[in-house]
């Protein structure tokens, strides 16, 4: 009995330490990650490994920086920008608006891929096809999201979805071990370079945007403040960040390896959502389609919930008010988010391309956030907690990386729409 109590206590302590990080993993490891990493691996093997490594490295630096400011001052970042920058109010308002727009745009891709895969699964399992099924799936998923978010009772569903995503994540890790390419290929992919092919710049920006995004950084600050963490919890925050980013890296690189070891060797790049099923075939065989679709739809829905909630969260950051899921403002944005979800599957764009476009857009707006946090961490009122030389070098690296990814994103989006 005592042993059981000790185990429960250990689990409780682990969850307490990883609280904010679990949100980040749930938000980050979803449809966007699977789509971009699988697309990259299927087209160019392991040659874009450097993008995953640098994205995760600078995600860690960004999370550390945003966490540090909130732990020291107790302020969230948008509010700090509004209060402490010259022209801070319009700058913070622009960042808030850009994050909301980018996240709402990403809802279209998340819902489009989820509906597309469920539709294909029903056709595969039953042999029956009807255009009305897609509409029924779209309305059903949107209605479920609306009811859950309106009531605020979605914790149980989140746990179920997290379990499904975990199964998919473990499946990718195990498959990666079966099809892992040579170390020579992996190390060659650590040398930065972008393939001279159409869509390469857009995909590189999308890979960065799905990992190192402004939304994750601001949500990190908001969740720390909501938990009441201050400098006394700095060690817990650091452990939480390391574990979260470590899991992001492992799962992202595993997905790329799976695609490189299956689709790339067959010369079958991901063109449609259903193509990604093949990445799990070495492990699951004929069950790959069911395993993949259950996992990625779980990942999609688990990403839809925090993506819709980001709008009221960043508004509460900007206005320096408590997060209230039952407020009129929150419910307006929940309603808008669900309407966007309804539209997603019917946009005249391939769901895979749509998902990559939305991830690239997140990379485009990143530089403002990295520049802002670097300035905030160098202000006099932080005293001994100001950035030292090492942290400033790290922040400058994050700024440079975000500018390069933003450039790739702009060029990629421009090329696509032209």
Please report, for each region that a protein language model flagged, where it lies by residue.
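Transmembrane-helix boundary/entry motifs in multi-pass membrane transporters
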Residues: 7-11, 45, 72-101, 124, ...
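Extracellular/periplasmic helix-exit of transmembrane alpha-helices
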Residues: 61-72, 224, 246-275
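Hydrophobic alpha-helical segments and their helix-loop junctions in multi-pass secondary transporters
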Residues: 166-193, 201-205, 210-221, 370-382, ...
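Membrane-interface loop-to-helix entry segments
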Residues: 140, 144, 148-179, 359-366, ...
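Transmembrane alpha-helical segments of multi-pass small-molecule transport proteins
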Residues: 96, 122-150, 167-173, 324-343, ...
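Hydrophobic transmembrane alpha-helices that form the core helical bundles
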Residues: 90-126, 300-319, 351-353, 403
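Flexible loop linkers connecting adjacent transmembrane helices
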Residues: 2-4, 36-39, 65-88, 122, ...
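Extracellular loop-to-transmembrane helix junctions
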Residues: 12, 39-64, 81, 87-91
């Amino acid at each position: 009995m005592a042993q059981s109590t000790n185990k429960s206590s250990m689990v409780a302590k682990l969850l307490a330490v990883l609280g904010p990080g679990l949100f980040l993993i749930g938000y980050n490891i979803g449809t966007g990650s699977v789509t971009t990493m699988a697309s990259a691996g299927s087209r160019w093997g392991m040659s874009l490994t450097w993008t995953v490594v640098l994205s995760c490295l600078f995600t860690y630096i960004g999370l550390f920086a945003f966490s540090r400011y909130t732990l020291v001052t107790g302020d969230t970042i948008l509010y700090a920008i509004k209060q402490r920058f010259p022209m801070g109010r319009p700058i913070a308002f622009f960042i808030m608006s850009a994050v909301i727009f980018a996240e709402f745009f990403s809802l279209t891709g998340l819902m489009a891929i989820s509906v597309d895969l469920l539709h294909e699964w029903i056709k595969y399992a039953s042999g029956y096809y009807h255009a009305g099924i897609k509409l029924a799936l779209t309305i059903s998923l949107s209605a479920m999201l609306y009811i859950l978010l309106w009531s605020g009772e979605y914790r149980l569903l989140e746990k179920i979805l997290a379990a499904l995503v975990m199964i998919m994540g473990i499946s990718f890790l195990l498959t990666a071990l079966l099809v892992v390419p040579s170390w020579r290929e992996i190390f060659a992919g650590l040398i930065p370079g972008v393939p001279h092919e159409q869509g390469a710049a857009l995909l590189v920006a999308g890979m960065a945007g799905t990992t190192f995004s402004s939304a994750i950084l601001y949500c990190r600050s908001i969740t720390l403040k909501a938990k009441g963490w201050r400098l006394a919890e700095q060690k817990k925050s650091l452990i939480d960040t390391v574990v979260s980013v470590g899991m992001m890296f492992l799962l992202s690189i595993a997905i790329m390896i799976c695609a490189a070891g299956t689709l790339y060797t067959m010369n079958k790049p991901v063109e449609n959502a259903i193509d990604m099923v093949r990445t799990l075939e070495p492990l699951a065989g004929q069950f790959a389609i069911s395993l993949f679709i259950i996992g990625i739809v779980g990942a999609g829905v688990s990403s839809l919930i925090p993506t819709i909630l980001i709008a009221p969260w960043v508004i509460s950051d900007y206005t320096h008010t408590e997060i209230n899921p039952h407020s009129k403002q929150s419910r307006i944005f929940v309603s808008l988010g669900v309407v966007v979800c309804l539209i997603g599957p019917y946009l005249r764009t391939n769901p895979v391309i749509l998902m990559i476009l939305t991830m690239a857009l997140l990379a485009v707006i990143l530089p403002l956030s990295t520049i802002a946090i670097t300035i905030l961490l160098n202000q006099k009122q932080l005293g001994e907690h100001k950035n030292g030389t090492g942290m400033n070098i790290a922040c400058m690296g994050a700024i440079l990386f975000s500018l390069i990814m933003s450039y790739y994103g702009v060029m990629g989006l421009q090329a696509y729409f032209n």
